[in-house]
Amino acid sequence: ITILLVEVYAPAYDKSYDMRVEEQTSIRQLMEEMTVLIGQKERNYMAGELEKLCLCSIERGEMLSREQCLQDYGIGNGYRFVLI
C-alpha cells in the first residue's frame, strides 16, 4: 500500500488542505473524504453537495472521473487538486 500526500484547494473557502490517501483510492472516495475534512475544518458540512462537485488535477490539467482511482491517473506525492 502506497500512501500519498496531496493538496486540495477549495476556491469556495480560498484555502488549501493537505491529505494523506492511498494510491488505490477512487476519485469518488477521495472527494467524499475531502468534503468531510473541509466540512470539519470550516464547520460547514457539505452534505448533499458531493454530486455537484468536480475534482480537477492541476498537474494533469483535467477533470478526474469519479470511477477511476488515483493510480489510474498516475497521481503521486505532492499532486495538487482543485475541488469545485
Model feature map: region roles:
Residues 1-84:
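Ubiquitin system architectures
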